[in-house]
Amino acid sequence: MANARSGVAVNDECMLKFGELQSKRLHRFITFKMDDKFKEIVVDQVGDRATSYDDFTNSLPENDCRYAIYDFDFVTAEDVQKSRIFYILWSPSSAKVKSKMLYASSNQKFKSGLNGIQVELQATDASEISLDEIKDRAR
């Protein structure tokens, strides 16, 4: 599926892995990246259900952009177990301008194919996706 705005296609495996996370709950997180020629969005990393939140945040590169999905489990004040699927556009300040522009221009089209996202975030540094921030946004 090509993105009309940026010309970037989405590899079919991206939607397959998202479906596995959403419906089958096989994964804790998925990160997606653009291939080296900025022509296609592909699966970068997949974390299994036992993966910690720190492992997820540590998987995000300091100097490059990513799209990420995180399945966050939590317990409400009423002691009810819940889950929220987060979509994160990771665009660190230190990333190259070209990368930031292409990720931003492809963001809406890519995100629109991921039905079931409950919380969206854009982050430029780790503080914007701290565990406390995620907990606050999940409620």
From Swiss-Prot:
GO terms for biological process: actin filament depolymerization. Keywords: Actin-binding, Cytoplasm. InterPro entries: ADF-H (IPR002108), ADF-H/Gelsolin-like_dom_sf (IPR029006), ADF/Cofilin (IPR017904). Expressed in all tissues except pollen. Residues 7-139 form the ADF-H domain. One of its GO terms (cellular component) is cytoplasm. One of its GO terms (molecular function) is actin filament binding. The gene is ADF3. Actin-depolymerizing protein. Severs actin filaments (F-actin) and binds to actin monomers. Belongs to the actin-binding proteins ADF family. It is found in: Cytoplasm. Signal peptide: none annotated. This is Actin-depolymerizing factor 3.
